[in-house]
Amino acid sequence: MMFGFGLLKQYAGTTEQISTAAEALVGRSTTLTEALKAAAINVGRKPVETTDLAAIKEVEARAIGGDIESDGGVTAVASKAVARNQKIGEDNEKTNLGDVIAEIDVKVTRDREVTSEDAEAVIRAELNHSPFNNIIPGGVAESVTAAYKLNCNPCNVSL
């Protein structure tokens, strides 16, 4: 499903505005899993929430090209972390995004470059699960969008 770069324009800014997520990706492969690693660099100490889980699930499914394993992937790790975090009151005791993404190289065995469709889908997943209808600055959706921007640079697509 194409959205005509609408979400990318609205939530990611122009291609000239390289975010901290994009800066974290400079010199790295701009694949889906690298985008998750950039999110871990940017907001890795943030407790994992449902918003993150939805975005991670979308990234993992797109990286492997289909259905994700119910108990073996990074989505399963994120799901368990969210369930645990919902029971814990203190943020400093919660599982954070960096802990979940630390296992990505072992948990996700296939990967590919980020496309505009990937960025749109991850933004939509994060927005659909956000209680405030926004994406997390430096988070998964922004990092995937930054990876797309780097893959696209230089190109004549004006976001």
From Swiss-Prot:
A single GO CC term for this protein reads:
cytosol
InterPro entries from the xrefs? LEA_SMP, LEA_SMP_dom
For this UniProt record, the keywords arranged alphabetically read as follows:
Cytoplasm, Nucleus, Repeat
Q: Name one Pfam family in it.
A: SMP
SMP domain span:
30-87, 96-151
Q: What are the cysteine partners in each disulfide bond?
A: none
Cellular localisation: Cytoplasm; Nucleus
Family assignment from sequence similarity: Belongs to the LEA type SMP family.
Job description of the protein: LEA proteins are late embryonic proteins abundant in higher plant seed embryos. The function of those proteins is not known.
Q: This chain belongs to which protein, by name? A: Late embryogenesis abundant protein 50
